Swiss-Prot record:
The gene is Nubp1. InterPro entries: Mrp/NBP35_ATP-bd, NUBP1/Nbp35, P-loop_NTPase, YlxH/NBP35. GO terms for biological process: iron-sulfur cluster assembly. Component of the cytosolic iron-sulfur (Fe/S) protein assembly (CIA) machinery. Required for maturation of extramitochondrial Fe-S proteins. The Nubp1-Nubp2 heterotetramer forms a Fe-S scaffold complex, mediating the de novo assembly of an Fe-S cluster and its transfer to target apoproteins. Belongs to the Mrp/NBP35 ATP-binding proteins family. NUBP1/NBP35 subfamily. It comes from the Eukaryota. PANTHER family: CYTOSOLIC FE-S CLUSTER ASSEMBLY FACTOR NUBP1, NUCLEOTIDE-BINDING PROTEIN NBP35 YEAST -RELATED. Binds 4 [4Fe-4S] clusters per heterotetramer. Contains two stable clusters in the N-termini of Nubp1 and two labile, bridging clusters between subunits of the Nubp1-Nubp2 heterotetramer. Its cofactor is [4Fe-4S] cluster. This is Cytosolic Fe-S cluster assembly factor Nubp1 homolog. Disulfide bonds: none annotated.
Amino acid sequence: MQAPPPEHCPGVESEQAGQVSACAGCPNQSICSDPNKKREDPGKALVAAALKDVKHKLLILSGKGGVGKSTVTTLLTRYLARSYPDSNFGVLDIDICGPSQPRLMGALGENVHQSGSGWSPVGIDDNVCLMSIGFLLGSVDDAIIWRGPKKNGMIRQFLSEVDWGNLDLLLLDTPPGTSDEHLSVVSYLKDDSAPDSVHAIIVTTPQEVALLDVRKEINFCKKQQIPIVGVIENMSGFRCGHCGHSSEIFPAKTGGAAAMCAEMEVPLLGSLPLDPAIAKACDAGEDITSVKNPTTEALEGICSKIMSSFN
């Protein structure tokens, strides 16, 4: 019989299970530290049951914060939903301490309702729904000061207690880096009997300081055996709306994402320009993917490659 886990338990599937200071004195320490005695987290079965009608799961990752990962998640979702009106898309915002999808999707102030089948995600369009901890806060200015285990518990709730229904694709907007949240969501989503049950896209900017961390993110995916759909280079250049001249705001001193992808043997899905109109629309929660511009032209090719990777 196992005792309840301590407050800061790293989790039974963590590589640190039974080894960190929080494990000292826990009656389960010997079980967790022995790989032959570890049990699978019971939450994994709950997640599998809740997501049985979700065809594909796509992690949107970034090694470095500030590269526009959440904005790219929104743009991809909006463009995919417009391009594939007969498909259903969901977005799960698991950036627990910095949830931005409610603003980007124009859903600030919306409420999450509970039914017999679980939490109902917020409807954004006819074929797009969204779930974020931002909907559960009293104010957009409320700070979330949680340790890893509590964040992991929230992620498990989002995956197992939200009524996602039938989705063709669930996009997960993750925090930057490779933290507890990433390990938690991967452990819940990975299905050993279906190795391609979850995929990843990695967002970067051209400069080397961002690419350094993207290499770590790629290695994280390879270690966790998460297939990488490809890399998106965001803010790759700025084209003046008046004269049409293109400028490199973030110069690619080492060849940018293209050179890094060739080096790491991962696909480059495409590049998105630095566009003030996109920033303005995202701040207002507006969808401008129907307007033809350099960003939507790039999104067309990127989204086509994404959908092709699932076929």
